[in-house]
Amino acid sequence: MDHDASSTARLFLAAVPDADTALRIYRLAAALKRAHKFDGKIIEPDRLHISLFFLGGSPNPIARMACEAAAEVRAPSFEVLFDRTVSFRGRPGNRPFVLLGDKGLDRLRSLRRTLGVAMARKGFRCLAKKDFTPHVTLLYAERNVEEYPIEPICWTVNEFVLHVRLARWPLRA
């Protein structure tokens, strides 16, 4: 585990794209924002991620428990692929516009289940039972659009992180 910061506001565990892929996603989001005439602010490349678990604005003991659970996880690296965009339902005027896909996402779901079991052993409750639709949020907009195919974007998930890189754990079998 590698610690990079100390803030615990809005903690979550996530898979993140590499820097080149994040920049590609950001550029795609900018083009789609123009094409769909969205008004929202695009998520910056260093904040793009696939959320695995949201932990809330947690105090340090919760962060420590999450770190202990994450350190127990063993899983090989895998590829994810996103090939379409869509708007999710959200609060009026604040609808998430996201990347969706299928390829590799079963392995991501498996990683999430494994992490959920480890977190349950540390005292977290019911995390793995919640619905999970793997996605990358590009921006939040006032209106929504239907599903739209895109040139596939893929990357190899080599690690998962706590909040925007508070801590990280490499994937290894």
Question: Whereabouts are the PLM-identified features?
Answer:
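Histidine-dependent nucleotide/RNA phosphoesterase domain, centered on the 2H-phosphoesterase fold
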Residues: M1-A173
